[in-house]
């Protein structure tokens, strides 16, 4: 499943739409580091892409699915450089470095971060979120196409289609959705 846009339209930057501050406020660095520690995925040495940056990178990829991996990383690092001490500059690594960093990290820390942070957020005054003292949630499910490789096909399979099999392996998921805010939580993935 290819990403179709190599970069954002001219005159716009990813940081114009969302800043590193929004991601880091929703997923605080302390919580990210705590989860990296508990999963044994902290960076053992200083790398171009430390583990906490890779976590934020994966989050940014989910937000900007049509933009190339390298462009998402460049814009993310631009935000990190802006927040860092003057004169420090983070280099955008090559494609193989990005892939190696994501492989080193694995899915465990991202799943654990999701489970720790993504929770229902409705207050008692949120319209449509409560019935008397009970929080209202809906069960929803869907599928998402994933990269066309042997590992994903073995893990998730390919659904049938009118002429054979579908073009991509698909992840099936079910999630609780908080009425009133539409926050998905308690998500479970399956093949």
Regions found by a protein language model. Give the residues of each.
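Conserved, well-structured functional cores that handle cations and Mg-NTP chemistry
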Residues: 1-191
């Amino acid at each position: 499943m290819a990403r179709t846009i190599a970069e954002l339209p001219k005159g716009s930057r990813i940081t114009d739409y969302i800043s590193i501050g929004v991601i880091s406020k929703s997923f605080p660095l302390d919580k990210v580091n705590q989860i990296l520690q508990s999963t044994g995925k902290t960076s053992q040495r200083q790398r171009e892409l430390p583990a906490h940056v890779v976590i934020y990178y994966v989050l940014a990829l989910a937000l900007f699915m049509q933009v190339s991996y390298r462009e998402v990383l460049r814009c993310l690092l631009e935000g990190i450089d802006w927040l860092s001490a003057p004169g420090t500059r983070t280099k955008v690594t090559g494609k193989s470095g990005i892939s190696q960093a994501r492989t080193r990290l694995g899915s465990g820390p991202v799943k654990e971060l999701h489970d720790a942070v993504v929770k229902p957020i409705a207050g008692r005054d949120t319209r449509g979120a409560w019935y008397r003292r009970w929080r209202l949630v809906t069960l929803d499910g869907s599928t998402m196409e994933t990269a066309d490789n042997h590992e994903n096909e073995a893990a998730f399979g390919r659904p049938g289609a009118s002429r054979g099999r579908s073009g991509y392996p698909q992840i099936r998921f079910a999630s609780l959705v908080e009425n009133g805010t539409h926050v998905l939580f308690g998500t479970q993935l399956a093949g």
